[in-house]
Amino acid sequence: MSQLPNLISIFRTTLAIGISIIVLRNPENEKILNYAFWITWTVILLDGLDGIIARKLKLESDFGAFFDIACDRITELIFISLFAILRWIPFWILIVFLVRGILVDGIRGFAGKEGKTAFGKKSMMKSKLGYFLTSSRFMRGSYGAIKAISLSFMFLVHSTMPQFLNLEMFLIYLMTFYCVIRGVPVLIEGRRFFN
């Protein structure tokens, strides 16, 4: 029972990998793309569920927080890589997510050595703006919602709703903007861990 949140994280990451492999092999199969839409929503809902279970059952831990973020990053990069490989999005978006992820997660690793976490009471963020952009429920929730919609909707746009491609690309660019704007404070405030 104590590992339930982590098992959910493993399951959702495995689902993302599985559906991405299937879509990669059948990128024009309307039925598969429609399934991918629903499976992506399931992956995203499970991301919220693991945290809720950890809090409700008092199973929160530093490792659990790290593992959740790692699975989030893996899942995010799986979908963005898939979209870039299929040329559904510009390749530079994948580069942005990779570079941001490596830099931010690297700094968070150094912060973790000093007992700081990405979110919560032990957050590494000191400034109010930095905390708001990276750790506030509003920013985490709105970024999560934008990711959920843009990542899942991409499959519908390429199956039954091509008329919404411009809207989908707007959402992808908005998601990328959020990715960058939430990473900048970590880069700025994280410098203190290298002194």
Regions found by a protein language model. Name each.
Residues 34-41:
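Structural signature of hydrophobic alpha-helical transmembrane segments
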Residues 2-9, 13, 21, 38, ...:
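A feature for the membrane-embedded catalytic helix bundles of lipid/isoprenoid biosynthetic enzymes
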Residues 21-30:
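Short, hydrophobic transmembrane alpha-helix segments
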